Regions:
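Extracellular ectodomain segments of secreted/surface proteins
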Residues: 117-140, 349-368, 490-499
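Low-complexity, acidic Ser/Thr/Pro/Gly-rich terminal tails and inter-domain linkers that flank the onset
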Residues: 209-225
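Extracytoplasmic soluble-region selector
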Residues: 164, 181, 193-195, 202-205, ...
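Substrate-binding/catalytic cleft of secreted carbohydrate-active enzymes
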Residues: 1-139, 143
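Structural beta-strand segments of beta-rich domains
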Residues: 141-145, 230-234, 371-375, 489, ...
C-alpha cells in the first residue's frame, strides 16, 4: 500500500490490487503492553493482539492497511494476508503455525477480526462494537483499552462511570479506533456505540473474572445427517464461580464422545502448543478449545463430555438423523484416525498457571534515599502445579536492562535495587512445564535522583538499546531492531564510560 501512489504515478494505466496485504501478526487473547511500543517478539513466543505487533516488511498497522485503499480509487481492493492462521510460516518465531490470520487455526476470531468488521460493515444495518483486552491484570497497572466499532461515536464506562467519549471517522487512519488508558482494578468495562442522533445501537462488556470453576460446551449445530461427511464444531470454554468467561484460562481439558459420534480432533489455536490435534486432551488457550465431532454412519445421539481437574464437567447431547447418501467407509476412517503421539498426554492431569498477580507495598518510584522495594507474586489458580518463578528487569520492549538488580527473598518475593534513573519493568514468568516462558506479568517502576547509567564499551550492548536514531527503524526478531528497507538509517548508542585508561570523547 505504501508504494501504490508512486506506482500509479509511474504507470497510470496499470490495474492495481493487493493480493497479499497487511501481514500484521497477532495471537488470540494475548496482549503485550504498552500499546505505544512496537513489540514484534516477546518471551512468551506470542504476538500481541493490541495492534502493536508488525513485521518490518508489512503494513505499519491495521488502520493503514484498511484506510489506504479508501483514498486510492485506482486500486481494485485487497486480500488480507491472511484470513486464517495456517500451519507453517510462523513469522517471527519457529513454532507450529502462522500468526498472520484474523482467525486462529481453531476458527476463533482474534481482535483484528473485529477491527476489519468495524471498517467494512455498515452501522445502519449491522451495528457492532468490540472491547479489548480482557479485564484481569495487576492492581494499578496501566492498561491500554481499545474499542472497535462501525458507529460514528463510542463511549467507555467503568463500573457505570463514564471514562470518555470519542467521535470516529472510518476514513481517517488516526481516528478509526477509540483508545483509552486506565489503571486496572476489578470491575466491568462497558463500551457503547451511538448513531448520528445519539441513540445507542450496540454495546460490549468485559468483566473481571476469577479462577475457572466449570466448563461450558456450545456447538455450531445440534443435529446433523449421519452421512459421514458432516462435522460438528464444539467450543469449550471455562467459567468462573459467577459465570463469567475466564479469558486467560489454560486448564487441561479431557474430552470423551459416546454414542453415534467420534472425536475427530482438538485445537486451541496456540502456535506454541505442539500436542497432537487428533488426541483426546489439550489445554485451553486464552480460555478456549475446539472439539471436532465426527458422527458415525448411524442415526442416534452423541454425548460429548468435557472434564478438567478441579472443575465441574460439562455435557452436551447432539443428534444425528438417518441419511440415504453416505460417504465411503475409508474416508470416514481417515477422518477419525487417532494420532499415536496423543497417548503421551492422554492421561495428563497438570493444572497450569493462568496468570501471575504482582504487587508492591511501596509506591513503584525508587530514589537515592529509597532505592529498593519488595515485590510479591501470586499465581492463579492457587492449586496450579508448583514451579519456579523467573524474574528479570526489562524496558518496555522486554529487553533486559542494567538499571537495577534483583535479589531473591523466597519463592514468591523479590527485592529490586535501582542503580540509575529511568523507567523499567520487573517481569515474572512461568513455563508451565514446557521449558520456555509461556506467560508473564510485569510491574512498572520509575527510578529518579539516582544518576545516569553509562554503558560499558568493553562488552556487548544489545542492539535495540540505542539512544537515538535517524531514518526508518522497525521491529526485529528476538527483541531486536531492524533498519528500514529503503533509505539510510543511522543509530546512536551511549553514554559510555571508557574508564581511566580510555577516552570518553
Amino acid at each position: 500500500e505504501r508504494l501504490y501512489n508512486k506506482q500509479h504515478a509511474d504507470h497510470p494505466d496499470w490495474v492495481i490490487y493487493g493480493s497479499e496485504t497487511s501481514s500484521t501478526v497477532q495471537s488470540r487473547g494475548i496482549y503485550h503492553f504498552p500499546l505505544a511500543k512496537p513489540l514484534l517478539t516477546d518471551d512468551d513466543g506470542q504476538c500481541s493482539s493490541l495492534g502493536n505487533s508488525t513485521v518490518n516488511w508489512g503494513a505499519k498497522n491495521q488502520q493503514f492497511c484498511a484506510v489506504s485503499d479508501l483514498h486510492m480509487p485506482f486500486s481494485l481492493g485487497q486480500f488480507l494476508w491472511s484470513g486464517f492462521d495456517y500451519i507453517g510460516e510462523p513469522t517471527p518465531y519457529q513454532s507450529r503455525n502462522s500468526f498472520f490470520g484474523q482467525i486462529d487455526t481453531a476458527g476463533f476470531p482474534k481482535d483484528a477480526y473485529y477491527f476489519y468488521q468495524s471498517v467494512w460493515t455498515d452501522a445502519k444495518t449491522n451495528p457492532m462494537i468490540h472491547i479489548l483486552p480482557y479485564w484481569d491484570f495487576n492492581p494499578g497497572q496501566m492498561i491500554d483499552v481499545r474499542v472497535y466499532t462501525n458507529a460514528p461515536k463510542a463511549a467507555l464506562f467503568f463500573n457505570d462511570t463514564l471514562i470518555g467519549e470519542k467521535k470516529l471517522a472510518h476514513t481517517q487512519e488516526d481516528n478509526i479506533i477509540a483508545d483509552w488508558s486506565l489503571p486496572y482494578k476489578k470491575g466491568v468495562l462497558t463500551a457503547i456505540a451511538y448513531d448520528e442522533a445519539g441513540n445507542e445501537i450496540a454495546r460490549d462488556t468485559k468483566h473481571s473474572f476469577g479462577d475457572s470453576s466449570s466448563l461450558r460446551l456450545s456447538a455450531d449445530r445440534l443435529e446433523v445427517p449421519a452421512n459421514g461427511e458432516e462435522l460438528i464444531f464444539v467450543t469449550i470454554d471455562a467459567l468462573d464461580a459467577d459465570g463469567y468467561p475466564v479469558d486467560n484460562a489454560t486448564n487441561r481439558v479431557h474430552v470423551t464422545v459416546e454414542g453415534e459420534g467420534l472425536l475427530a480432533g482438538l485445537d486451541n489455536g496456540d502456535s506454541t502448543d505442539y500436542e497432537p490435534y487428533k488426541g483426546d486432551c489439550r489445554r485451553l488457550f486464552s480460555g478456549k478449545l475446539l472439539a471436532i465431532i465426527a458422527p458415525t454412519l448411524n442415526a442416534g445421539t452423541i454425548t460429548v463430555t468435557a472434564s478438567s481437574d478441579g472443575l465441574k464437567d460439562a455435557v452436551l447431547t447432539l443428534n444425528t438423523v438417518a441419511c440415504k447418501n453416505r460417504c465411503s467407509d475409508d474416508l470416514h476412517i481417515m477422518t477419525i484416525t487417532r494420532d499415536p503421539l496423543a497417548d503421551a498426554v492422554s492421561h495428563a492431569t497438570d493444572i497450569p498457571v493462568r496468570s501471575i498477580t504482582l504487587s508492591c507495598e511501596d509506591p513503584c518510584i525508587l530514589t537515592a534515599s529509597k532505592p529498593s522495594a519488595v515485590i510479591s507474586a501470586v499465581t492463579h489458580p492457587a492449586n496450579a502445579a508448583a514451579q519456579p518463578l523467573d524474574w528479570k528487569v526489562t524496558n518496555a520492549e522486554g529487553v533486559v536492562v542494567p538499571y537495577a538488580t534483583l535479589e531473591q527473598i523466597d519463592d514468591t518475593h523479590i527485592r529490586i535495587l535501582a542503580f540509575a534513573d529511568g523507567n523499567f519493568f520487573v517481569r515474572c514468568s512461568v513455563t508451565n512445564g514446557r521449558g520456555c516462558t509461556v506467560l508473564y506479568s510485569m510491574l512498572e517502576f520509575k527510578a529518579e535522583q539516582i544518576g545516569t547509567m553509562n554503558l560499558d564499551p568493553y562488552s556487548f550492548t544489545v542492539g535495540s538499546l540505542y539512544t537515538y536514531a535517524e531514518g526508518e527503524v522497525a521491529n526485529g526478531n528476538a527483541h531486536g531492531t531492524a533498519t528500514g528497507s529503503e533509505g539510510t538509517t543511522s543509530i546512536t548508542y551511549g553514554p559510555f564510560d571508557f574508564g581511566t585508561f580510555g577516552t570518553d570523547t
